[in-house]
Curated annotation (Swiss-Prot):
<keyword id="KW-0648">Protein biosynthesis</keyword>
<dbReference type="GO" id="GO:0005737">
    <property type="term" value="C:cytoplasm"/>
</dbReference>
<protein>
    <recommendedName>
        <fullName>Peptide chain release factor 1</fullName>
    </recommendedName>
</protein>
<feature type="modified residue" description="N5-methylglutamine">
    <location>
        <position position="229"/>
    </location>
</feature>
<dbReference type="InterPro" id="IPR050057">
    <property type="entry name" value="Prokaryotic/Mito_RF"/>
</dbReference>
<dbReference type="InterPro" id="IPR004373">
    <property type="entry name" value="RF-1"/>
</dbReference>
<keyword id="KW-0488">Methylation</keyword>
<dbReference type="GO" id="GO:0016149">
    <property type="term" value="F:translation release factor activity, codon specific"/>
</dbReference>
<dbReference type="InterPro" id="IPR045853">
    <property type="entry name" value="Pep_chain_release_fac_I_sf"/>
</dbReference>
<comment type="function">
    <text>Peptide chain release factor 1 directs the termination of translation in response to the peptide chain termination codons UAG and UAA.</text>
</comment>
<dbReference type="InterPro" id="IPR005139">
    <property type="entry name" value="PCRF"/>
</dbReference>
<dbReference type="Pfam" id="PF03462">
    <property type="entry name" value="PCRF"/>
</dbReference>
<comment type="similarity">
    <text>Belongs to the prokaryotic/mitochondrial release factor family.</text>
</comment>
<dbReference type="InterPro" id="IPR000352">
    <property type="entry name" value="Pep_chain_release_fac_I"/>
</dbReference>
<dbReference type="Pfam" id="PF00472">
    <property type="entry name" value="RF-1"/>
</dbReference>
<keyword id="KW-0963">Cytoplasm</keyword>
Length: 351
C-alpha cells in the first residue's frame, strides 16, 4: 500500500523548494535548497507518473458505462493495469530512505590478511582493481598512505576516492576478500588460499565529528617506502593518535602541513564510521542486517583464479569473468548487491 499522505508531503515540499529558489535564496541556503530539490526531483517524477497512471485507469473504468466508449475502455484498461506493478515498484524504490553518506567521497583501506607474501600481493591486485574501476567511472583516486613490501605487495594502503555516488557504489566492498591461486613462487603448482581486508568509509564532514585537541597526540617521523627505506630527508610524515579510541593515522606526503590536514581528515572519517557502525547495530537490533553494512570480518567474496570465477557469498552470485573483474569490471556485481539491498528494504517496509 502506497501512503498517499506521504506522497502529498513530498510533493508539497518539492513545490516549496521550487518557489524558494525562484524567490532568490542566497548564500549557503541556496546550495542546501538546490541539493534537496535535486534529491526530491526523481521521487516527485515517480509520484506524478504513478498518479497519472491511476487517473488513467479511473477514467477508463468510468468509460465502461458509456456505450460509445466501452469498447475502447475494454481495450485500454488491461494495458494500463499491466503497467501498474512496474510503476508501483519504481515509486516504492524512489521512496526508500536514502543513506545521507551515499553521495560522499570515500576512504578506501586495504590490508593483507592470512597468507603472508601472497596476501600482500593480492592486496596490491585489489588496489589496482579499484583504481581501474574508479578510472572507468570518472572518479579521482588519491593515495594517502601506501606501504609496499619488497616483493611488490602491499602492507597497507589508504586512498581517497571522490566523484559521483562513490560511497553508494563502493560501500558493498567492505569485508574479507579471499583469493585462491597458485603463487608465482610455488614450484609444486599447489593452490594457495589467502585473504585481504577491504574497508570503505564515507568521508566525514566537519559537522559530523568534532575532535577535542586534548584527545589527540601528533608525532612527526621520516617517511618510508618499500622495505622501510627513507624516501626523503625531512621529518615530514605525521602520525596522529586519537587517545580515547586508540585510532592511529599516518600520512607521508612531502609537506608536513598537508600531512596534518590529510591525517585529521582520515581520523575524522574513521571516528564518523565508528558512530555509523554503532547506529547500524542499534537499527539492526529491530530489523534484519542489510548487505553492505555487515561485519567487516565477514568473508564476502572469493576470487578463484584456476577456475576463472568470482563468487560473492552474500548473494550467491558467481561470475566466470575473473580477468575482467580484476581489470575493474565491477558494475555487474555491485548492481546485483544494490538490487538485493533494495529488495530487503522493500520487504521490511511491507512487514
Amino acid at each position: 500500500m502506497i501512503p498517499e499522505e506521504r506522497l502529498d508531503q513530498i510533493t508539497q515540499r518539492f513545490q516549496y523548494l521550487e518557489a524558494a529558489m525562484a524567490d532568490g535564496a542566497s548564500g549557503s541556503d541556496i546550495a542546501a535548497l538546490a541539493k534537496e530539490y535535486s534529491d526530491l526531483r526523481p521521487v516527485v517524477e515517480q509520484i506524478a507518473a504513478w498518479r497519472q497512471l491511476c487517473a488513467d485507469m479511473d477514467e477508463a473504468r468510468a468509460m465502461l458505462s458509456d456505450p460509445d466508449m466501452k469498447a475502447l475502455a475494454e481495450e485500454e484498461l488491461p494495458l494500463l493495469k499491466a503497467r501498474l506493478p512496474e510503476a508501483e515498484q519504481a515509486l516504492q524504490l524512489a521512496l526508500l530512505p536514502k543513506d545521507a553518506a551515499d553521495a560522499r567521497p570515500a576512504m578506501l583501506e586495504i590490508r593483507p590478511g592470512t597468507g603472508g607474501d601472497e596476501a600482500a600481493l593480492f592486496a596490491g591486485d585489489l588496489l589496482r582493481m579499484y583504481q581501474r574501476y574508479a578510472e572507468a567511472r570518472g572518479w579521482k583516486l588519491e593515495l594517502i598512505e601506501l606501504q609496499e613490501t619488497e616483493l611488490g605487495g602491499i602492507k597497507e594502503v589508504v586512498a581517497r576516492i571522490s566523484g559521483e555516488n562513490v560511497f553508494a557504489r563502493l560501500k558493498y566492498e567492505s569485508g574479507v576478500h579471499r583469493v585462491q591461486r597458485v603463487p608465482e613462487t610455488e614450484s609444486g603448482g599447489r593452490i594457495h588460499t589467502s585473504a585481504a581486508t577491504v574497508a570503505v568509509l564515507p568521508e566525514a564532514q566537519d559537522v559530523d565529528i568534532q575532535i577535542d585537541p586534548g584527545d589527540i597526540r601528533i608525532d612527526t617521523m621520516r617517511s618510508s617506502g618499500a622495505g622501510g627505506q627513507h624516501v626523503n630527508t625531512t621529518d615530514s610524515a605525521v602520525r596522529i593518535t586519537h587517545l580515547p579510541s586508540g585510532i592511529v593515522v599516518t600520512s607521508s606526503e612531502k609537506s608536513q602541513h598537508r600531512n596534518r590536514e590529510i591525517a585529521m581528515q582520515v581520523l575524522k572519517t574513521r571516528l564518523y564510521d565508528l558512530e555509523r557502525q554503532r547506529l547500524d547495530r542499534e537499527r539492526s537490533a529491530s530489523r534484519s542486517a542489510q548487505v553492505g553494512t555487515g561485519d567487516r570480518s565477514e568473508r564476502i567474496r572469493t576470487y578463484n583464479f584456476p577456475q576463472g570465477r568470482m563468487t560473492d557469498h552474500r548473494i550467491n552470485l558467481t561470475l566466470y569473468k575473473l580477468d575482467a573483474v580484476m581489470q575493474g569490471d565491477l558494475d555487474e556485481v555491485i548492481d546485483a548487491l544494490a538490487a538485493d539491498g533494495q529488495a530487503r528494504m522493500l520487504a521490511e517496509m511491507g512487514q
